[in-house]
Amino acid sequence: MAAALTVASVGLSSCVGDLDVENINPQKTSTTEYDYILNKVYANLVLTGQKGPDGEGDLDDIDEGTSSMIRQLWNANSLTTDEAKCIWGDEGIPEFNRNNWSDAHPMMKALYYRLYFGVTLSNYYLENVKGDDNETLTMRAEARFMRAMFMYYLMDLYGNVPVKTSVSSEATPQSSRSEVFAFVEKELKDIVGDGEGNEVLADKRATYGRADKVAGWILLSRLYLNAEVYTGSAQWQKAKDYADKAIKGGYSLCTEGKNGYSAYQLLFMGDNDTNGAQNEIVLPAIHDGMETQTWGGCLFIIAASNSSSKTDVNLGTSEKWGGNRVTKQFAEKFITDEAAVKDLVEPSEVAKAAGDDRALFSCAKHTISMEDESDFYSGYAYNKFTNIHSDGTQPKHTQFVDTDFPMIRLAEAYLNYAEADARLNGNRCSADGLAKIKDLRKRAHASEPSAFTLEEVCDEWAREFGFECMRRTTLIRFGKFGGDSNYYWQWKGGSVNGKQIDSKYNLFAIPNSVVSETIKQNPGY
């Protein structure tokens, strides 16, 4: 929580014209304030400005409430897929739901600027903090890790983007997706000790919320798992090797429940920094109801998935926005008997009936099929994230949440390993890959299979990582998103039963506000 991450008090803002930081004078910035700037790099995952939920936003000409990185990562990776749809009519939401966005999409513009704001903060820190002592070298490695992660998301979402490594008003030329991949790969390999230089991450974080080698290994594994999409050349063995390093890196799956909550529930609760989940959460985006107030982050995920009008699910916050619910295709990856859950309100009861601790739906008054785009009760609510504290203590704030968002957790290494293993073994997991699947399903009290195919791995990604900003990337990797795919979900392409969408949607449009002679638009937009 916020005790582990002091938010920068230095005046920071961004100019959306050149995406550089203004109002930082190096001659007036103390060493302590540079530490605050590194903290601001981390806080960029959650916060949007200098005054809590709104006021003095980081980004010019962007609605602050829509500029939260996690909120827009979630929208881009959930609403566009078989996971969820939102009933709101806010500009950009219907376009996400129906897969028909343009280069004027306001939320993808906000996310583009938010990610580059993180890159610029990282660059500013790296340009001004020098030294060869171990602490400085490690902190510089952390700033490079965060910059690499921001660049990874830019590459994943937008494809060909500029690689910015300095704070400058000069225009940075556009790089190809393969070139961005090579940059991210080299940066990550350097800072985990597999490349050049002596700026290396700690073997294991000393402070919760800081990046370490395991975070670097998992992000490398993710990078290699998607290498075929990003570069045209598969790198399954490297994905598997770095996943294996991470699995053996000193973290552990959260497998013990507490006070009536399942181990899986603990990962997404208001005290997930102390309840045992912290041993699995490798890199959290830290939240604190008093200190990190935002309309994005985990508050958005929790509040938008709950409503006070018909159901009464206590999720630990007074905010109940009634927006997001899941498609039939997502629910049916857990629910095989609709009649057994149709009258159940509490997600834990649904999970028990479904035989999978991850089936954290609220079903009463809802229909499993999303026939009506505008009705919150058309489609199940998915209440995986909560602000409830497992030890029975009260949240720090009645409105804003304490729940940390797991940007990277160890379970990803298990699924990366299993998927890469299946792809290396004729689309079926070997005994080693199957063991990783069994570990996750055993934790969820789900049936343990005797065999697992690559197609089943795709569904397991949905079960394990629903609402964690993973689904769009997964579907593209499996050839189930844009282009010649026969995998449909409700409202894909604007049809209630789903239909194919153009392959151009495998990338988002570069915001039209930055397209220029040096930054070209993606094909089809």
Protein language model regions, located:
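Bacterial Sec-type N-terminal signal peptides, specifically the leucine/valine-rich hydrophobic h-region
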Residues: 9-12
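Membrane-proximal, proline-rich intrinsically disordered regions
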Residues: 15-69, 518-525
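Conserved, well-structured interaction surfaces
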Residues: 31, 35, 39, 43-49, ...
